[in-house]
Amino acid sequence: MSDKILQMFFDIGRWKKAIEKGVLKDIRKDQLIRLTDEHTRMAMADAMIRGKYEIAPPHTAQIPTENGEFRTVYINEPVDRVVLGIANDLLFELMPDMVHPSCKSYQSGIGCGSVVTEASRRIAETRGGGILGWKSDLSKYFDSVPIRYIDEAFDKVEARHGRSSLIDVLRKYYHNDLYFDEDNRLQAKYQSLKQGCPVASWLADVLLHDLDEELSGMTGYYVRYSDDMLFIGKDYGKAMQVLEQRLGEKSMKLNPKKVEYLMSDRWFKFLGFS
């Protein structure tokens, strides 16, 4: 198999790990048992190589948020969840430098608690009163990234590791707008990162690498956890200007209700912690 990425994808160790995860996530055991069969995996590989393998349209679900609203997530079929989970882990492994050090989300060993602890330490070290910096939230980040940036991310993977049938499968899925709504009716609309799909985690981290690089180079402390951002330090004003400008260039924007300037004498909430 000359397809390096596909060969790594079908490594038996990855499938064992993914199937174990599937048990913990309550994926039906009959589906997982199918995937333990070498003939099943060989048939999947053959279909991918021939361009015949497709991820099924997801089902939508409404998940409540902290402010009482709901967000739409896209839930994949059981086998597709396993396939996409393996693909997501592999993408992180293949392209570690596409995730900037200031981006902390969806990575093994890094949780919200450790991010908030470090941010609290940086705030405590900041001298002076008044405005310390800001926190912000991207407006519908998972729903608003244009497809060209998703394609560019996959292009970078293939530029380094060679063309892959697995990347073809992912591209095809991200270009497919079909989904089933809560009433099981087939619908179509652009889903951007497809929040709920495992690969959305990798995409959410890597697509803002250039912005992460620019903001982390300013005077201050910058950290991002998916669509939540925090900047503490002297350049907070400049950082906000650059943030809004760069997002606008990518057809994205901040949620104005979630932009908050941080004061030395006032508590604030970040990633669920106060």
Predicted regions and their residues:
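Non-catalytic, polymerase-adjacent accessory regions of viral genome-replication enzymes
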Residues: 1-44
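Active-site-proximal segment of RNA-dependent polymerases
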Residues: 84, 88-146
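Beta-rich nucleic-acid/ligand-interaction surfaces
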Residues: 106-114, 230-233, 262-267
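Reverse-transcriptase-like RNA-dependent polymerase core
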Residues: 46-68, 167-183
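Conserved pre-motif C helix in the palm subdomain of viral-like polymerases
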Residues: 69-100, 189-217
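Conserved polymerase palm-domain catalytic core
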Residues: 122-226, 230-246, 250-252, 256-263
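Short, low-order "capping/linker" segments at domain edges
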Residues: 268-274
